[in-house]
Amino acid sequence: MKITDIRTSEFSVPLRTPFKTALRTVTAIHDVLVTVTTDDGRHGYGEAPPTAPITGETIGSIRCAVEEFIRPALLGREIEDLDGTMHALHTAILHNTSAKAAVDMAIYDLYAQERGVPLYRLLGGSKTELETDLTISVNSPEEMAADSLTAVGRGFRILKIKVGLRPELDLARIQAVRKAVGPKIAIRVDANQGWSPAQAVRIIRGMEDAGLALDLVEQPVKAADLDGMAYVRRNVSTPILAD
Protein backbone atom coordinates (compact mmCIF):
# COMPACT_ATOMS: atom_id res chain seq x y z
CA MET A 1 0.00 0.00 0.00
CA LYS A 2 1.87 3.04 -1.31
CA ILE A 3 1.25 6.71 -0.61
CA THR A 4 0.09 8.37 -3.82
CA ASP A 5 -1.06 11.77 -2.58
CA ILE A 6 -1.16 14.05 0.46
CA ARG A 7 -3.53 17.01 0.53
CA THR A 8 -4.53 19.68 3.01
CA SER A 9 -7.75 21.61 3.51
CA GLU A 10 -9.08 24.05 6.09
CA PHE A 11 -12.18 23.90 8.24
CA SER A 12 -13.73 26.05 10.96
CA VAL A 13 -16.05 25.22 13.85
CA PRO A 14 -17.56 28.18 15.76
CA LEU A 15 -17.60 27.93 19.55
CA ARG A 16 -20.80 28.55 21.48
CA THR A 17 -18.88 30.74 23.93
CA PRO A 18 -15.36 32.20 23.62
CA PHE A 19 -12.56 30.15 25.17
CA LYS A 20 -10.08 32.38 27.01
CA THR A 21 -6.57 31.78 28.31
CA ALA A 22 -3.73 34.09 29.26
CA LEU A 23 -2.40 33.68 25.71
CA ARG A 24 -5.48 34.23 23.56
CA THR A 25 -9.24 34.27 23.17
CA VAL A 26 -10.68 31.72 20.75
CA THR A 27 -14.12 32.20 19.17
CA ALA A 28 -13.83 29.43 16.57
CA ILE A 29 -11.63 26.44 15.87
CA HIS A 30 -9.66 26.93 12.64
CA ASP A 31 -7.77 23.74 11.81
CA VAL A 32 -6.04 22.00 8.92
CA LEU A 33 -7.26 18.59 7.75
CA VAL A 34 -4.62 16.35 6.18
CA THR A 35 -5.68 13.53 3.85
CA VAL A 36 -3.19 10.83 2.86
CA THR A 37 -4.27 8.67 -0.10
CA THR A 38 -2.85 5.29 -1.12
CA ASP A 39 -2.74 3.35 -4.37
CA ASP A 40 -5.64 1.10 -3.33
CA GLY A 41 -7.95 4.09 -2.85
CA ARG A 42 -7.86 4.29 0.93
CA HIS A 43 -7.77 7.61 2.76
CA GLY A 44 -6.19 8.35 6.14
CA TYR A 45 -6.97 11.52 8.03
CA GLY A 46 -5.14 13.75 10.49
CA GLU A 47 -5.75 17.16 12.02
CA ALA A 48 -3.35 20.01 12.73
CA PRO A 49 -4.29 22.93 14.99
CA PRO A 50 -2.43 26.20 14.34
CA THR A 51 -1.28 27.48 17.74
CA ALA A 52 1.15 30.24 16.87
CA PRO A 53 1.72 31.43 20.48
CA ILE A 54 2.78 27.90 21.47
CA THR A 55 4.29 26.08 18.47
CA GLY A 56 4.80 29.03 16.12
CA GLU A 57 2.62 27.39 13.47
CA THR A 58 -0.17 29.00 11.45
CA ILE A 59 -2.63 27.57 8.95
CA GLY A 60 -0.38 28.82 6.15
CA SER A 61 2.80 27.36 7.62
CA ILE A 62 1.15 23.98 8.29
CA ARG A 63 -0.16 23.71 4.74
CA CYS A 64 3.22 24.76 3.33
CA ALA A 65 5.12 22.24 5.48
CA VAL A 66 2.83 19.39 4.45
CA GLU A 67 2.49 20.21 0.75
CA GLU A 68 5.95 21.56 -0.05
CA PHE A 69 8.19 19.45 2.19
CA ILE A 70 6.44 16.41 3.68
CA ARG A 71 4.44 15.40 0.60
CA PRO A 72 7.50 15.03 -1.71
CA ALA A 73 9.33 13.07 0.99
CA LEU A 74 6.52 10.54 1.42
CA LEU A 75 5.14 9.98 -2.09
CA GLY A 76 5.73 6.36 -3.09
CA ARG A 77 6.46 5.26 0.48
CA GLU A 78 4.97 1.98 1.69
CA ILE A 79 2.59 2.28 4.63
CA GLU A 80 3.76 -1.16 5.79
CA ASP A 81 7.29 0.23 6.22
CA LEU A 82 6.13 2.23 9.19
CA ASP A 83 9.59 2.96 10.64
CA GLY A 84 11.00 4.11 7.31
CA THR A 85 7.95 6.21 6.50
CA MET A 86 8.01 7.89 9.89
CA HIS A 87 11.72 8.60 9.56
CA ALA A 88 11.10 10.25 6.20
CA LEU A 89 8.28 12.29 7.74
CA HIS A 90 10.29 13.58 10.66
CA THR A 91 13.39 14.41 8.60
CA ALA A 92 11.50 16.15 5.81
CA ILE A 93 11.52 19.48 7.67
CA LEU A 94 12.73 20.74 11.04
CA HIS A 95 10.18 21.53 13.78
CA ASN A 96 6.64 22.05 12.36
CA THR A 97 5.30 19.63 14.95
CA SER A 98 1.58 20.11 14.31
CA ALA A 99 2.03 19.51 10.59
CA LYS A 100 4.02 16.35 11.27
CA ALA A 101 1.51 15.15 13.86
CA ALA A 102 -1.38 15.41 11.40
CA VAL A 103 0.46 13.34 8.80
CA ASP A 104 1.51 10.89 11.51
CA MET A 105 -2.17 10.41 12.47
CA ALA A 106 -3.17 9.83 8.86
CA ILE A 107 -0.44 7.24 8.31
CA TYR A 108 -1.42 5.32 11.44
CA ASP A 109 -5.06 5.53 10.32
CA LEU A 110 -4.10 3.81 7.07
CA TYR A 111 -1.86 1.30 8.85
CA ALA A 112 -4.82 0.19 10.98
CA GLN A 113 -7.22 0.18 8.03
CA GLU A 114 -5.01 -2.20 6.09
CA ARG A 115 -5.02 -4.64 9.00
CA GLY A 116 -8.75 -4.31 9.58
CA VAL A 117 -8.47 -3.50 13.28
CA PRO A 118 -9.01 -0.35 15.36
CA LEU A 119 -5.86 1.71 15.85
CA TYR A 120 -6.05 1.46 19.63
CA ARG A 121 -5.65 -2.31 19.34
CA LEU A 122 -2.53 -1.95 17.22
CA LEU A 123 -1.07 0.46 19.76
CA GLY A 124 -1.83 -1.88 22.65
CA GLY A 125 -4.79 -0.05 24.16
CA SER A 126 -7.28 -2.18 26.04
CA LYS A 127 -9.42 0.31 27.97
CA THR A 128 -12.95 1.17 26.96
CA GLU A 129 -13.00 4.25 29.18
CA LEU A 130 -10.40 6.91 29.98
CA GLU A 131 -10.81 9.54 32.66
CA THR A 132 -9.88 13.04 31.55
CA ASP A 133 -10.15 16.54 32.93
CA LEU A 134 -12.27 19.39 31.61
CA THR A 135 -10.76 22.81 31.01
CA ILE A 136 -12.48 25.86 32.45
CA SER A 137 -11.97 29.09 30.49
CA VAL A 138 -10.63 32.12 32.36
CA ASN A 139 -13.43 34.54 33.24
CA SER A 140 -14.74 36.23 36.37
CA PRO A 141 -14.59 34.15 39.57
CA GLU A 142 -18.37 33.81 39.53
CA GLU A 143 -18.51 32.58 35.93
CA MET A 144 -15.68 30.12 36.50
CA ALA A 145 -17.36 28.74 39.61
CA ALA A 146 -20.60 28.24 37.68
CA ASP A 147 -18.79 26.60 34.75
CA SER A 148 -16.92 24.30 37.13
CA LEU A 149 -20.12 23.26 38.87
CA THR A 150 -21.67 22.46 35.50
CA ALA A 151 -18.65 20.32 34.61
CA VAL A 152 -18.92 18.39 37.86
CA GLY A 153 -22.61 17.89 37.18
CA ARG A 154 -21.63 16.27 33.87
CA GLY A 155 -19.46 13.76 35.73
CA PHE A 156 -15.99 15.31 35.55
CA ARG A 157 -13.89 14.75 38.67
CA ILE A 158 -10.77 16.60 37.49
CA LEU A 159 -10.82 20.25 36.39
CA LYS A 160 -8.08 22.24 34.68
CA ILE A 161 -8.63 25.89 35.57
CA LYS A 162 -7.20 28.55 33.27
CA VAL A 163 -5.72 31.62 34.96
CA GLY A 164 -3.05 34.24 34.21
CA LEU A 165 -5.30 36.83 32.57
CA ARG A 166 -5.47 39.69 35.09
CA PRO A 167 -3.41 37.79 37.70
CA GLU A 168 -4.77 39.90 40.56
CA LEU A 169 -8.01 37.89 40.21
CA ASP A 170 -6.43 34.44 40.12
CA LEU A 171 -6.58 33.62 43.83
CA ALA A 172 -10.23 34.67 43.96
CA ARG A 173 -10.94 32.55 40.88
CA ILE A 174 -9.57 29.37 42.41
CA GLN A 175 -11.20 30.09 45.76
CA ALA A 176 -14.56 30.47 44.02
CA VAL A 177 -14.09 27.24 42.08
CA ARG A 178 -13.06 25.26 45.15
CA LYS A 179 -16.01 26.59 47.14
CA ALA A 180 -18.39 25.64 44.32
CA VAL A 181 -17.14 22.10 43.67
CA GLY A 182 -16.11 21.04 47.16
CA PRO A 183 -13.02 19.22 48.43
CA LYS A 184 -13.29 15.96 46.47
CA ILE A 185 -12.79 17.41 42.98
CA ALA A 186 -9.18 17.56 41.74
CA ILE A 187 -8.12 21.03 40.61
CA ARG A 188 -5.23 21.69 38.24
CA VAL A 189 -4.26 25.27 37.49
CA ASP A 190 -2.86 26.37 34.11
CA ALA A 191 -1.43 29.89 33.94
CA ASN A 192 -0.43 29.62 30.25
CA GLN A 193 2.79 31.60 30.86
CA GLY A 194 0.75 34.47 32.34
CA TRP A 195 2.80 35.15 35.48
CA SER A 196 6.27 36.43 36.24
CA PRO A 197 8.33 34.18 38.53
CA ALA A 198 7.70 36.48 41.50
CA GLN A 199 3.97 36.64 40.75
CA ALA A 200 3.83 32.87 40.42
CA VAL A 201 5.40 32.28 43.81
CA ARG A 202 3.16 34.86 45.48
CA ILE A 203 -0.05 33.56 43.89
CA ILE A 204 0.71 29.87 44.39
CA ARG A 205 1.70 30.44 48.01
CA GLY A 206 -1.57 32.31 48.47
CA MET A 207 -3.45 29.31 47.13
CA GLU A 208 -1.49 26.99 49.39
CA ASP A 209 -2.12 29.18 52.43
CA ALA A 210 -5.84 29.19 51.58
CA GLY A 211 -5.86 25.39 51.63
CA LEU A 212 -7.05 25.06 48.04
CA ALA A 213 -5.33 21.67 47.58
CA LEU A 214 -4.09 21.92 44.00
CA ASP A 215 -2.92 18.87 42.06
CA LEU A 216 -0.40 20.99 40.16
CA VAL A 217 0.25 24.32 38.45
CA GLU A 218 1.03 24.19 34.74
CA GLN A 219 3.41 26.57 32.94
CA PRO A 220 3.30 29.49 35.39
CA VAL A 221 5.97 31.54 33.57
CA LYS A 222 7.25 31.98 30.01
CA ALA A 223 8.07 28.62 28.43
CA ALA A 224 11.64 29.66 27.62
CA ASP A 225 12.30 30.93 31.16
CA LEU A 226 13.79 27.76 32.61
CA ASP A 227 15.48 29.67 35.42
CA GLY A 228 12.10 31.18 36.29
CA MET A 229 10.49 27.74 36.33
CA ALA A 230 13.23 26.46 38.62
CA TYR A 231 12.77 29.49 40.91
CA VAL A 232 9.06 28.81 41.21
CA ARG A 233 9.61 25.12 41.87
CA ARG A 234 12.09 25.85 44.64
CA ASN A 235 9.79 28.28 46.40
CA VAL A 236 6.41 26.53 46.46
CA SER A 237 5.15 23.14 47.62
CA THR A 238 2.69 22.53 44.78
CA PRO A 239 4.02 20.42 41.87
CA ILE A 240 4.95 22.53 38.82
CA LEU A 241 4.28 21.16 35.34
CA ALA A 242 6.08 22.34 32.21
CA ASP A 243 4.07 22.54 29.00
Task: Show the residue positions of the predicted features.
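N-terminal capping/lid subdomain adjacent to the active-site entrance of alpha/beta enzymes
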Residues: M1-R188, N192-G194, A198-V201, R205-E208, ...
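Catalytic alpha/beta core domains of metabolic enzymes, predominantly
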Residues: I54, A224-D243
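A short glycine-rich beta-strand->turn/loop micro-motif centered on a GG-aromatic cluster
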Residues: I70, E218-V221
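Structural detector of well-ordered beta-strand residues that form the stable sheet scaffold
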Residues: D133, R188, E218, P239-D243
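Short acidic/polar active-site loop segments enriched in Thr and Asp
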Residues: R157, A213-D215
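Short, catalytically relevant binding-site loops at active-site mouths
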Residues: G194, K222-A224
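Generic hydrophobic alpha-helical scaffold/packing signal
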Residues: I204, E218, A230-R233
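Short loop-to-alpha-helix "cap/lid" segments that border enzyme active sites
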Residues: G206-D209, A224-L226
